[in-house]
Curated annotation (Swiss-Prot):
Belongs to the ATPase alpha/beta chains family. The keyword Amino-acid biosynthesis does not apply. GO terms for molecular function: ADP binding; ATP binding; proton-transporting ATP synthase activity, rotational mechanism. It comes from Acidobacterium capsulatum (strain ATCC 51196 / DSM 11244 / BCRC 80197 / JCM 7670 / NBRC 15755 / NCIMB 13165 / 161). Its EC number is 7.1.2.2. Produces ATP from ADP in the presence of a proton gradient across the membrane. The alpha chain is a regulatory subunit. Keywords: ATP synthesis, ATP-binding, Cell inner membrane, Cell membrane, CF(1), Hydrogen ion transport, Ion transport, Membrane, Nucleotide-binding, Translocase, Transport. The keyword Cell inner membrane applies. This is ATP synthase subunit alpha. It is found in: Cell inner membrane. ATP binds at residues 170-177. Disulfide bonds: none annotated.
Amino acid sequence: MAQIKADEITALLKEQIANYDAKVRVDEVGTVISLGDGIARLHGLDKCMAGEMLEFPHGVYGMAMNLEEDQVGAVLLGDYTEIREGDQVKRTGQILSVPVGDAMIGRVVNSLGEPIDDKGPIAASDRFPVERLAPGVIDRQPVREPMMTGLKAIDSMIPIGRGQRELIIGDRQTGKTAVALDTIINSKGRDLICVYCAIGQKRSSVAGVVQTLAKHGALDYTVVVVASASEPAPMLYLAPYAATAMAEYFRDNGKHALIIYDDLSKHAVAYRELSLLLRRPPGREAYPGDVFYLHSRLLERSSKLSKEKGGGSLTALPIIETQAGDVSAYIPTNVISITDGQIFLETDLFNSGVRPAVNVGLSVSRVGFSAAIKAIKQVGSTLKLDLAQYRDLAAFAQFGSDLDKATQNQLNRGQRLTELLKQPQFQPLSAEQQVMILFAGTQGFLDDIKVPYIRAFEDGLYKYLDASQRQLLNDIATKKALDDELRGRVKDALNEYKQNFLDEHEDARVKSETAQAAGKDKDEKAAATAGAGK
């Protein structure tokens, strides 16, 4: 039998005690007391923070939203079907954050920044909290740089600047998403990173958007964040904040970013659902009292930073869907008051073939032409007023046929300008192309061309400029303003092209009044002769 030596045991025990490293892990743990509709009520988390991430069983996370006296109301982010009453919940001590960085570009992710495009994991360089304070007044500078959308109707009358918040508002099926996508496609090669945030849309619609962006090469500089209609309300609520955090990474690194929220009406509905399930008191239209703050704290994060902060910018194009054109409803008026202007798209204009269906009278940019390049301002500054006056005159002209010559000229010019501002989808124009065609419209080059030929005139003009006047376009793009010399060259180019166009299309010219009168007399004589013969 082996003899036990006390000194060896003592030595071993002393060694164990000396090497013992006391690591005590303390977790604050609570219990699920009720669960339903994506909302969990928890007991025992006395030191829980508002907005803190909570760890549930089966790898599900939640976010604390209601801090009550004896319990915590949390929203669940993910599949909660396996969680039961009585399950344990742990505090993480962290605020919800999402991955950010250049690796996000070209990817489709959900509200938590997890990839959903089957292209593998994302090696993100950093993580940002979804809720961040907006930059202060000292950290900002005024909006001065233009952000071209490529749409004549917007760039010439409702110019948008980098760092601005411009609302796109209208009924369903009026082309709101199309305007936003055109802006993304037009951003190619303009040093702009785009983030498209789809909130509460059908997966098929989002797939169509992603395919369109890929087809035009726009995914190379775009991040797509998706919270589809089939996902629970907490994911819809988080989506715009997560997307903004991803866009802020580029802004904070001195780059320029554009974010599109499509749309904030569904975001407000998701927040209303969450609030009612959390038993918060309802207000107007059953929305909670802080629904204004919901959108104001989101949209205030879009800004143009000062040079000391890197000079980056984040431009926001939130989308709001109205019901039967009612812009005075609760959510539309809230977002109109938060943003720096709105682009109002009208169903009647859309159905009559005016696309983009921008209602010039109700649309406005509160930054104005300080954000537009000077050449656009020179050719388009009177356009909005001319079109508004044309609409008024057109309404009155229906009641009487005897119009003086000045009124008739104004109506004719208005018809041609309206036709000129129509634009096919996904065909954005450069600033210099817009300057040329708007100059032609506002300076009377189209006054003697029949309205049905305006579209052909415009298409031919772009081909002519590319083939014969490339230097002129380059000079407009470089100078960004029309001086006397450049204005003369523009007129010469337009006169030359117009003559060629009329030679090819002889019936495109409007007959002069003398010729029209002679034709009318001839018709009357022929009718009188025919009557006498009978």
